Each structure stands twice: as structure tokens, then as C-alpha cells.
Amino acid sequence: MNNQDTRFANQYAIQWFPGHMAKTLRMMEQEIQHVDASLVLLDARIPLSSLNPEIERITARKPKLYALNKADLADPAVTEEWIRYFHEADAGCVAISAKQKGGANAVKAAIERELSGLLARRQNRGMAGAKTQVMLCGIPNVGKSTFLNTFAGSARAKAADRPGVTKGKQWVSTEKFDLLDMPGVLWKKFDSKTIASNLAFIGSIKDDILDVEELAMNLLDEVRRNYPDLVAQRYKLDAETLALPPYELMEAIGRKRGLLVRGGEVNTERCAVMLVDEFRACKWGRISLERPPQRDDMADFAEEDEE
């Protein structure tokens, strides 16, 4: 098989929409009517790809704040570009790391800014003490449970570094806010291979349904285009090796790491798992997989980014 020619053949066909996600979307359509606002967590490495068009549709008529979570894993300069992009579209947006308390405090302050009109009206009506009800939503594995625990100051939600941990809605109450945590949800069909690949790279699609070797090759090919020095430094690669076709590059890295089977062949599956795991753990360095597109408004976020 010619791995270089076929490396994108299957990524375009990635789909993952189990039944509980359809149920979650129906639940969100009901619950959005009873909250004051929505807080949409996006992955700071892929803000566009992690923006679920179904969540956008459901939350469109309520005040909304976007939080670019896992900002500690993303390229800080690119994250600043995204913040400007959202703000220029008059969309509230903050960059956070859910594991850090400062991120939760930034979100609380931003929610109050976004809802300043509502809070002022409540104060005029003698309801200044009423808690603000906010729906927390996003794609799987975007860090909602970790954020919720930091926001609440205690372990209220089960958190894990894999998609699909939160299965049902739950209310979490703090001094000023009642947060409705919704399970992570994707959408029925990814019409863009870029979106599907990006979601797979960060672990928002179950690894069990993916070809891990193809995933690792695609990831290497993507990252070395924009961050060649980080890949070269991590795996001690010279320029000639870094320029190899993706499969040969993966083999070269596996050989350097001693990931061999009997006969001296590289265990490419084991190498692929190592590569994906190290990227997700930020061992390659702080990397962003997409930059803001040249678009005029936030409505374009829901459109396909390419064929």
C-alpha cells in the first residue's frame, strides 16, 4: 500500500454520533428555554472545528460566552488571534485552562459582563440576589467536567481524558451561578475532512473507531507543516528525515524510540499510539491546529471549512 497517497482516504469518512448524543440535543432544546445564557467550551487548539453547529443553532437566541479551554496546550500567539477574531465579531470569548482556578474566575467575570443588562434589570426589580442559570455545553473531551469542578470549587463531576464520560445532565450550584452541565455532543455528519481529523487528533472521537496509524500519519503531516522545529526537537530528527513521506517518518521515529518487533521491523501501531498520546499530552509543545479564517462574522462558523 502506498501510505503517502492514501493517508487522507479514510479520515474523510470518520463519523461518530451514538444514540445518546441525539438524546442530548433534544434535551438541550428543552433546557435552553429555562436558562439565562449558555457557556460553550471550545478546544483552544481547534476553536473552529470544536464549534458544534447544532449547539450554535440551539443556543442562538440566548446570550452566549465562548471559552477557549486547554489554552495551556495551544500556541499562545494563535490563541490571541482567535480571541481578537471573536471580539471583532462582537462575541464574548475568554481563553482558559480548566484545571486552573484563575480560568474559572475569568469565566465568571465574563458571564457577568455578557449578562450585564439582565443583571441590571433584576436589580431594578429587587431580584439582585437571584442566581444566574447557565447551560454548559461543548463537544466530547473538551474539558467540561474539569472546568465544572474548578468552577464549583469541588469534585462535582466525573472527569477523564476520553470522550463520553458525562452521560446525563446535572445541575451544579455556586454562590452566584447555577450551571447546567450537558453531556458532550457532536453532530450527525462531518462534511469536512479537516474537522473530522482535528476532532480525532484531540481525542473528541473515540479512538476505538479510528485507524491509529493513519491518524498518527495525518497528525505528523499536519504539525510538521506549521511547527517543524517542535517535531524535530522532540524526536531528534534532521531536516532530511523530517521531510520523509508520513509513513516513512513514522517508521524513522519508531526506530529511534526502539519500538521494534522481532526481525528489527518497526511496530508502527505502537509508534502511532505513542505519537498521538504525546501530542495530546503537549509533549511536542504548545500547538494550534487551525488559525482564524478570513471571515466577516460568527455566522460563518457553522459553515463547512472546505470540501
What function would you assign to each model-found segment?
Residues 106, 110, 146, 218, ...:
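Alpha-helical scaffold segments in soluble metabolic enzymes
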Residues 1-38, 45-46, 51-53, 58-64, ...:
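Helix-rich effector regions associated with P-loop NTPase G domains
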Residues 40, 66-68, 136:
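Structural beta-sheet core signal
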Residues 127-129, 151, 172:
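Solvent-exposed alpha-helices and their adjacent loops that cap or buttress functional pockets
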Residues 72-138, 258-260, 266:
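Canonical P-loop GTPase G-domain recognition
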Residues 98, 148, 177-180:
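Conserved active-site beta-strand-loop modules that form the wall/rim of enzyme catalytic pockets
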Residues 133-153, 157, 182:
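Glycine-rich phosphate-binding P-loop
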